[in-house]
Amino acid sequence: MPRKGPAPSRQLVKDPVYGDVLVSQLVNKVLLDGKKSTAERIVYGALEQCREKTGTDPILTLKKALDNVKPALEVRSRRVGGATYQVPVEVRPGRSTTLALRWLVTFTRQRRENTMTERLANEILDASNGLGASVKRREDTHKMAEANRAFAHYRW
């Protein structure tokens, strides 16, 4: 750890269209090779498709999807006396949001629809309805934490 203490967390910039920090974080997760305008076009197109399909505010749909994907617990490896244990720990709010966005984008890229915009829109809609691979990933993470509950006393 540096002598000056931890680095201060940076203030996130709200995106210009929706005025929401979550959307700008999603744009940054979709971003590849520094092509931000392409990432913005994909995200805004996906949110517009969500609006057309549900008839509701796409930001609310995105927030509901993220709430369904955010993990509350995760396992971290802890080495104790030559054995490595998977120790369940609670996830900090910032990390849970980051993990949710990462999983959403990762499983969006694995989908079979034609365009990235369609894939992202459908993954957001599935996640907001409690379906999809990203929600399954959260459930698997929680199952791992539950299975290793016996090692909870090793946590930091």
From Swiss-Prot:
Domain of life: Bacteria
GO molecular function term, any single one: tRNA binding
One Gene Ontology cellular component annotation held by this UniProt entry: small ribosomal subunit
InterPro entries reported in the protein's UniProt record: Ribosomal_uS7, Ribosomal_uS7_bac/org-type, Ribosomal_uS7_CS, Ribosomal_uS7_dom, Ribosomal_uS7_dom_sf
SUPFAM superfamilies, per the entry: Ribosomal protein S7 (SSF47973)
Coiled-coil parts of chain: none
Keywords on record: Ribonucleoprotein, Ribosomal protein, RNA-binding, rRNA-binding, tRNA-binding
UniProt-listed CDD domains: uS7_Bacteria
Keyword tRNA-binding: yes
Pfam families per record: Ribosomal_S7 (PF00177)
Gene Ontology BP annotations: translation
TM region positions: none
Family stated for the protein in its record: Belongs to the universal ribosomal protein uS7 family.
Function: One of the primary rRNA binding proteins, it binds directly to 16S rRNA where it nucleates assembly of the head domain of the 30S subunit. Is located at the subunit interface close to the decoding center, probably blocks exit of the E-site tRNA.
Subunit field text: Part of the 30S ribosomal subunit. Contacts proteins S9 and S11.
Name this polypeptide is given: Small ribosomal subunit protein uS7
